[in-house]
Design a protein with these regions (language model features):
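Conserved binding-pocket/active-site segment within a compact domain
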Residues: 112-142
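Ankyrin-repeat boundary/"N-cap" motif
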Residues: 2-9, 33-48, 71-85, 108-124, ...
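Ankyrin repeat A-helix N-terminal signature
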Residues: 10-16, 48-54, 81-91, 119-131, ...
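N-terminal accessory/assembly segment that mediates macromolecular interactions
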Residues: 40, 47-55, 60
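Glycine/serine-rich loop-strand microenvironments at binding/catalytic pocket rims
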Residues: 1-8, 53-58, 86-102
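Leucine-rich solenoid repeat scaffolds
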Residues: 145-176
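N-terminal alpha-helical scaffold/docking segments in eukaryotic complex subunits
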Residues: 8-9, 13-17, 23, 27
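Ankyrin repeat domain, specifically the short helix-to-loop turn at the C-terminus of the second helix
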Residues: 24-34, 59-67, 96-105, 134-146, ...
Length: 176
C-alpha cells in the first residue's frame, strides 16, 4: 500500500496501525490534528476503524482523544457502525469503552429508525456470547429508552422480551 498517496480513511480500511502511524510521520502531523477528521459522509476516522474491524486503531484513536457521538449523514454514531461487527474479537471491549464515554444509545439512524442500542442488541442476539450479553446488560444500566419504536414499530423492550436472555430480561424489569 502506498501510504504517501492514501488518505487516512483508506489506510484504516486497507492498512493497519503501523501504516497509519507511518502516514502521520510522513505528513509531520500530530494525532491530535487529525483524530476527529470526518469525510464527506460525516464518517469519522474512529467510525471508519469500527466499520473496518480495526479495533487496535479504534483504541489508539480513543486513547488520543477521539470524540464520540459523531453523527454521519446517515444519522449513525459509532455504536451503529460497531454493531455489525460486535461478534468480532476485540469489538465488545471497544463498545464498553464507548458506553463508558457516554455514547448516545438512543440515537436513531435514518433508514430504519433503529437506535444504537437496538442495532447492538439485534446483532448480539444473533450470536449469543457471555460478553455480548454482559454488554447489553451494561447498556441497559444506562437506562436507554426501551419503549421508543423504530420505523417497523418494534421497541427495544419488545426485542428483549421476545428474544433476549434472562439477564437482559431481568435488567429490563429493573428499568420498569
Amino acid at each position: 500500500m502506498k501510504v504517501n498517496n492514501s488518505d487516512y480513511g483508506t489506510i484504516i480500511k486497507f492498512g493497519n496501525l503501523e501504516l497509519f502511524l507511518e502516514k502521520l510521520k510522513i505528513e509531520g502531523k500530530c494525532i491530535r490534528e487529525i483524530v476527529n477528521s470526518i469525510d464527506k459522509n460525516g464518517i469519522s476516522l474512529l467510525e471508519k476503524s469500527l466499520i473496518s474491524r480495526k479495533f487496535d486503531i479504534a483504541n489508539f484513536l480513543l486513547d488520543s482523544g477521539a470524540k464520540v457521538n459523531i453523527i454521519s449523514t446517515d444519522e449513525c454514531n459509532e455504536l451503529h457502525y460497531l454493531a455489525a461487527n460486535i461478534n468480532c474479537p476485540g469489538a465488545v471491549e471497544v463498545a464498553c469503552r464507548l458506553v463508558d464515554m457516554g455514547i448516545d444509545l438512543n440515537l436513531k439512524e435514518k433508514k430504519f429508525g433503529d437506535s444504537a442500542i437496538w442495532s447492538l442488541c439485534q446483532e448480539v442476539l444473533k450470536k449469543r456470547t457471555k460478553e455480548g450479553n454482559d454488554l447489553i446488560v451494561k447498556c441497559l444500566g444506562k437506562r436507554p429508552d426501551i419503549n421508543d419504536e423504530n420505523k417497523s414499530g418494534y421497541s427495544l423492550r419488545y426485542l428483549i422480551e421476545e428474544r433476549g436472555t434472562e439477564d437482559m430480561k431481568k435488567a429490563l424489569e429493573v428499568m420498569s
